[in-house]
Amino acid sequence: MKNRAIAFRFYLIIVFVLFLQNNVLAATVSPTSITVGVGASANISVTNISGTVRATSLDSSIVTVTYANGQATVKGVKAGTANITIRDRRASRTVPVTVTAALSVTPSSVSININASANVTVTNVSGTLRATSFNINIATVSISNNTITVRGIGAGNTSVTVSDNVSSATLQVTVNGTSNPPPVSGNYTLLAWNDLGMHCMDGVDFSVFSILPPYNTLHAQLKNKSGALVTSGVSMTYEAVRNDIDVNNVGTGRLNSYSTKLGTDKPKTNFWDYTGKLFGLRPDGEIGLNLDGLATGNPEAGNPSPSLTPMPMTYNAEYKWYEAEGIPVTPFADEKDANGYIKDFYPTVQVVAKDTSGNVLATATTVLPVSDEMTCKGCHASTTSTNPAQIAAKPSSGWVNDVNTEKDWKRNILKLHDERKLALPLYQEALSILNSQNSGYKTTGLLPTADSGQPVLCVACHASNAYFDKRNKKSVMNGLVDNTGKGLAIRPFTQVLHNKHASVIDPDTTQALNKSSNRTACYTCHPGSKTQCLRGVMGKATTANGDSLMSCQSCHGNMEAVGNSARQGWIDEPTCESCHNSGETNRRAISGVGDTTNGKPIVPADHTFATNADKPAIPGLHPNLYRFSTGHGGLQCEACHGSTHAEYPSLHADDNVQSIAVQGHAGTVAECTACHKTEPNTVNGGPHGMHTTGNAWVSAHQEANKNGSPNCTYCHGTTSAGTPLSAIKVAKTINVGEFGVKNWPAGYQVSCFSCHNGPNPD
């Protein structure tokens, strides 16, 4: 009996060992089933290997498999299902494989005209269908079910990548343009724009603190066909219209026609619940703040959110534009999904000019960009993470762990601010002054203040030129003063924020923000990864590998430069001529890049592409801001070139709708017939001393060249070989006499070598 018991135990041990070999210690595969498209490949990880591994397809007409170094690679051959087996010395594993038919597009290429569209059918879609245009200045693309609509924007060739979860296909697109864009119909041209290219706001919640309110500004100028500005006898209105695409250039048709709520809907923001406590102003819901006149205690009337009802704009004689200051548009569309209001960073409005009889003279469509992607939650949100960079901002007494995520990171910031500053006499003095001005502020700190129901306005202590009264040419947020009228030594908001965070380690890159030379550092706090604020012709420029040629630091310098005490935030800004001067490239916009000795814009001697000095004329300061500068025919620079950070042609197609409408292609409004009935003949009377273009210039340019005009280098380069500034915008046919007829495609850089052997041919 004893021997039988021993034998039985021995038997159990053998069974257990075999079980371990065949199961616990046997090879494992991940994933255990897989889907792959025809022609596509996928990998299967193999672990716990014992001995030689063999991988076999049970139907190689459907799927093939190879194995190397712990990884089996399967490749789809044709649609169907088949199993593959993966075996080692101990066990065999079976992996079911589904091969889906490759995604296909019909037709595989399209040829359309500018402003025309074509539909393309997509079949064999697996999962989510996506479509991306390689060049949105030539063609844009939108999706509806399994149909792609391609729209011609500018003449040229491009491609559209169509993909789903397992495969992709390429659609070739040709957009045909006319030799010259047709003149705008009618006798007027209307140009409208947003002043900054992107406005930021705090988002949904204003109950804890506020950096920036919803505040957007719309400008417009009207030209008649004699090229003169129309400044009287017209009315100007704006109204909400659906945009064409979202930030990813995918068709959405979003509408943003209110900023509070409709009926019993949840409000898009609680801003109007706190305007009185924050700013001492109490506009009705849907009416925004207006800083103009506030410096002298007489603010102008606020303007409403865009709606389906046209709202009036007013004429500003000083700046010679029609304006709607402080429009309180939010980054939330009227449409909702399961998470609430859908984000809409590019609300669209239509501006309409009418005569005194109500006849429409001209219309323009533009965006009022706004983003709440200006959050600090990446470092200040309560978290259980142990990432040293992510918890560096954790208050010593712990996170607040507020269940309201919109309030949580803000309360953490105030808690940390109190923790680090409350013992300082300057901080105590500031709290005392705030309390004397508004009893809602507590002398015990800013977090107790917010928790008691009084939201904190950051710029109440930290001066900011972002709050600018352009009527009185001064900031309305100049910091705190004591009872003797002396200002407290509290650093301005722009300076303190950039200096303080220059040494902060980005949790994602583990690099100090100041060390970064690309836009990821700025996009950590500024509207970035989703909004794509820096989207203009410079911001979208890339290398052959797809890397950005320019970043925020290219113009503004690093964070220490932006926060340098020598510069005035929002006043000392880089200017066009800082880089664009003397016909040379690779210029630097500001001093101190790398050494941060100054951080102020470089002012060259050459002002061909200059903004205007002392615009606006601020006493004691000498700004020359692009958004206040004018050029050819009294037009604002932004009217023709586009808003700051969104210079034409923009990466976001909705920005380009207006320039396409007035001249037939996306880009700087550069075609004379956009504003003039006929093309003027001039040697240097155009914008920036520009000459006439087209056939009329063929004979005239000879005299200009003989006179040794140095102006040629500004656009054609110091070697006269052409630059992007000499590129034509749409395909043109030019008769150059003895040199024949030239057919130049859009984008061709005209140079002396286009017809001659250089600038001084024999």
Residue ranges and their predicted role:
Residues 2-12:
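Bacterial N-terminal signal peptides that target proteins for export
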